Amino acid sequence: MGWMKDETGLDKRDANYRALTPLSHLRRAAKVFPKKTALVYGDFRASYTQYHDRCTRLASGLAQLGVTSGDVVATLLPNIPAQAEAHFGIPACGAVLNTINTRLDKGTIAYIFDHGEAKVALVDTQFLPSVEAAIAEMESDGPLIIEVPDAAADYPASGRYQTYDALLESGDAAFEWIMPADEWESLALNYTSGTTG
């Protein structure tokens, strides 16, 4: 994790390394509210049980792609179910979620991919041109693209990449989530968009 190399003076202390994680929230919700609606997008509906299952399959699918603990998985997605699932599914395989602002230019996207060392990127079909242009500018190969079609917004799959649904279908619903050992394990990696002044 090259982006952590600049952090100093953050030694583990009793107050800062206990195992606290938001991953347990969804597991609890799936047990307490199994049939309650958790996600709504267009005609898509998912209960908390289904939401948990989809996150588990995402974690398993990513693990099958070789994503391991500490690897970065980027997303360029609007507010759709795949983004909500990424918030749990990516950390559930031990990886670090890197949500990238969809309004960024190709140079900034390339910088974030490179600096964050993204191994995989979940990309909405509408953002493929920006991501492909960003990867073309990179000296490294860039992340593996998993395409997230959005039929509700009239963005069908391009046919050039493995789709998000195919990744979920490849996942194991019995995959054991990899919970953080302590608070020092990264869950997310965020970059400013330059809008904070």
State the predicted function of each range.
Residues 34, 147, 160-162, 169-191:
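Conserved pre-ATP/AMP-binding loop-to-beta segment of ANL
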Residues 73, 94, 195:
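Conserved G/P- and acidic residue-centered "switch" motifs that form tight phosphate/ATP-binding loops
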Residues 16-38:
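A short N-terminal helical cap/helix-turn-helix that marks the beginning
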Residues 47-49, 187-197:
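Conserved AMP-binding A3 loop
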Residues 35-80, 84-88, 105-110, 160, ...:
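Conserved AMP-binding/adenylate-forming core of the ANL superfamily
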